[in-house]
Structure formats: C-alpha cells, structure tokens
C-alpha cells in the first residue's frame, strides 16, 4: 500500500508534526526514525545514517552562521539603517511596491548575482521596522522572497537556472528524450507564469489586509541609527561587495563571509574586541536554521538509504494504466513527496527521470510537455517544505524579532501560493503542450 511507503509515511508525519507546532528540528528527527523503522532498518543504522548524512549540508550550515555574523557586524556600522531609509523613500509608504521590489531583488540573487539566500539576513532584518510601520503582513513578504528563490531557476537559463536546466536536459537525454539545455526554458516559462500568478494572489488578495506587529529588538542586533553615508559605511559596502565577488569566484559562501569580516577589520569598521559579540549574535540569528539544515540532510540520507524512493517511483506504473491525465497527476504528486523528503529539487530530477521519461513516452507526451512535468515534479515541495532553504531563508530574516512563525507564516503560505499553481501549471503543460 502506497501510504505505508517509508517516504510517504515520514513526509506525512513531518507535515502533521510541524502543523502541530512541534519544533522543526524534532519533527525531522522523528520523521527520520519513522522512515527508518518503516523500512525495517535497525535503530543503530538509522541514527548512523542520520548523522553521516548531515555532512551533506555542512557547508550550508556554516554559511548560515557566518552570514548571520556578517549581518550583525554590518548592522553595527549603521549602514543597514541608511539602506532601510533609502528603501522607505523609494516605496513611499506603499507596501505592495515594497513586496514587488523585494521579489525582484530576490530574483537577482538566483541569476544576475547568484548568491542565493546570502542577502536575506543582511537586507531583511533592518526592514522589519519599516514593514511594521506599513502594517505589512509578513506572510506576503515570505511569498515574495520565496518567489525570487524559486521562479528564476525554474524558468530562466541563467545562474542557478542554468544548472537546473542542465540537469533536466542531461537526465532526459540519458533516458531517451533529447532536448538541448538552451531549449528547456521554452517550456518551463509556463511554470514561471503560474508562479507569478501565485505571487500576485499572495500580495493583492490573500495577504492584502493590514497586520499589526510590535517594534521589538532584533536577535543579536542593536539598533544603530545613521542618516548619511560616511567613510565607514562605504568601506562596509566595499567589504560586502568583496564577499560576493569572492563567493562567485571560489564558489564558497563561507569563504566570502570570512573575507568580508576580515576586510571590515582591516578597514577598522569593526573592532577586534567585538568579534565574540558578533559571532554570538550570528548564532542567535541563524544557529537554529543551520542545525535544521544539518538534520534535514541526515533525514534525506535516510530516505535514500531505505530504497523507498525507487519503490515509490516504480509503483506509478501499476497505478495509472494508460490514462494520460492520471499519469501526469500521479507523477506530480510523487515528485512533491520526494522533494519534501530529500529536500532538494535539483536532486529529485535524477531520481525520477529514469521512470518518468519512459512513462511520458508511453503516455504520448510531447518533449515540451515532458519537460514541464519533470521540472514541476522536481520543483514541487521546495516551497512549503519545513527544511528547504527556500523557506528557511525567508524565515531567518523575517523572524529576526521573534514575531514570524516558520510553519504558519512561511511554509503554509508558500506551499499554497506556489505548489498549487505548479501542480496546475504542470498538469496543463503536460496535457496540452
């Protein structure tokens, strides 16, 4: 029975526990145990695979803590306060303009300057006071940020999108359906369009009403007010730019963050004696999320070790018969479960392509329709997953004052506004392209 599959069972348990507001860290550990026990693994092997798998996100976790430290250090110079004032004057009291500006800025982090979530702990916490003044519902801001972290790599062959499209092209070609990497976007733009619809619904309909928040201090940060750009502020920006350049050249986000902190010390923007304070503040801001990413990698490792993903994918054949509509629907839903389980849309493609592409050929799907189904099946579950950086990133910035719930204010809104449109877009694309 498909409900007893370790992947399905553990994802359901994780979802229920998170919705009941159990800490995500504990929910992941319990879900990992459920997956292991359901697959008949000894408890020692389960914990061994959990711990061994954590290394998969070690660099990400270190990046989060160092980015938090950098964010606290930058905030201490007052440049964040100036940036907040500049953005406030730009949006001129219009919260919808702010949401769209942040969505566009977030998109740039995936292609124009591919730094992924690195900008969030630096840019978003200083803007919380402005959001409070505008009575902006932070659930809308979570949707804006997640849109920018997801839509560009799905729809555009630039930055992280080029990697995603390259994996799609390679796996499809390997399994009997040729498509050039540069042609993938000609199909996946449909999914991007449906995500834009989800974003607009979140901004203009679902979270349009005012929402009150208190002006509370930020975790690990002291408010530093500044009005005009001075020499130390320009040097701080120079250090931040250096971090991005080093990250782009070396491919190492931790190295970029360390370089920025070193530059700020050399420029005497921050003091040696304050480094401990910045580290403690960075851990306070990003520490929990870093640990969640570690445990999420361990959970994903257990899911893979059970062999249940292959069983789940293989079970599709017997479920759909010759129905094109049912086949597409099942492929999308199974993709959703797998991505929520292993935690990466990029990693889902190789797992499902070996079964999905022959199945698409059998059902008579076109190359374009198959691209859409495979891309949607992989991308589903990234938004809305409690352990995805597409949700943890936004929460890290929006919860800097402790007033933003990860599950109900980030995961649930982004799941509704992006996974449902992706399901619809994937189904329509598969059926009619």
Language-model features and meaning:
Residues 95-109, 134-154, 176-184, 324-338, ...:
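Alpha-helical transmembrane segments of multi-pass membrane proteins
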Residues 56, 60-64, 148, 186-199, ...:
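Alpha-helical transmembrane segments
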Residues 2, 7, 38, 177-278, ...:
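Long, contiguous bundles of hydrophobic transmembrane helices that form the permeation core
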Residues 4-15, 22-42, 61-69, 233-244, ...:
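Hydrophobic mid-bilayer segments of alpha-helices in multi-pass membrane transport proteins
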Residues 128-216, 391-433:
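Membrane-core helix-loop-helix motifs of multi-pass transport proteins
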Residues 43-132, 276-361:
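Membrane-embedded alpha-helical segments and adjacent helix-loop junctions characteristic
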Residues 1-95, 203-218, 432:
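N-terminal alpha-helical transmembrane segments of multi-pass membrane transport
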């Amino acid at each position: 029975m498909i409900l007893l599959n370790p992947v399905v069972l553990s994802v359901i348990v994780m979802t229920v526990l998170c919705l009941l507001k159990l800490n995500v860290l504990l929910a992941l550990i319990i879900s990992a145990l459920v997956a292991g026990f359901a697959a008949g693994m000894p408890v020692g092997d389960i914990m061994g695979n959990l711990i061994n798998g954590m290394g998969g996100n070690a660099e990400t976790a270190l990046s989060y803590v160092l980015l938090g430290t950098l964010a606290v250090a930058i905030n201490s110079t007052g440049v964040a306060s100036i940036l907040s004032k500049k953005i406030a004057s730009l949006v001129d009291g219009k919260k919808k303009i702010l949401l769209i500006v942040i969505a566009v800025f977030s998109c740039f982090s995936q292609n124009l300057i591919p730094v992924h979530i690195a900008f969030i702990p630096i840019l978003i916490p200083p803007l919380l006071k402005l959001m409070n003044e505008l009575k902006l519902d932070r659930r809308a801001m979570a949707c804006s940020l997640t849109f920018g972290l997801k839509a560009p790599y799905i729809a555009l062959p630039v930055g992280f999108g080029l990697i995603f499209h390259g994996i799609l092209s390679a796996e499809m070609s390997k399994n009997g359906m040729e498509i050039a990497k540069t042609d993938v976007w000609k199909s996946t733009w449909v999914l991007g369009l449906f995500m834009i619809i989800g974003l607009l619904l979140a901004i203009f309909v679902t979270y349009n009403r005012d929402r009150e928040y208190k002006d509370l201090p930020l975790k690990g940060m002291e408010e530093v007010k500044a009005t005009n750009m001075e020499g130390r502020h320009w040097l701080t920006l120079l250090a931040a730019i250096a971090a991005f350049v080093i990250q782009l050249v070396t491919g190492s986000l931790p190295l970029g963050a360390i370089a920025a902190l070193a530059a700020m010390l050399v420029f005497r923007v921050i003091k040696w004696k304050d480094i401990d304070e910045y580290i403690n503040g960075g851990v306070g801001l990003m520490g929990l999320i870093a640990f969640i990413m570690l445990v999420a990698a361990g959970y994903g490792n257990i899911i893979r070790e059970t062999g249940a993903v292959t069983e789940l994918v293989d079970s599709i054949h017997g479920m759909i018969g010759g129905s094109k509509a049912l086949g597409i629907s099942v492929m999308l839903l199974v993709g959703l479960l797998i991505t929520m389980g292993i935690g990466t849309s990029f990693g889902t493609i190789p797992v499902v392509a070996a079964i999905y592409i022959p199945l698409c050929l059998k059902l008579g799907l076109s190359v374009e329709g198959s691209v859409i189904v495979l891309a949607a099946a992989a991308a589903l579950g990234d938004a809305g997953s409690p352990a995805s950086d597409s949700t943890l990133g936004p929460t890290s910035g929006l919860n800097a004052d402790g007033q933003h719930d990860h599950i109900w204010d980030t995961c649930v809104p982004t799941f509704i506004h992006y996974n449902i449109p992706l399901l619809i877009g994937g189904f329509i694309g598969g059926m009619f392209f």
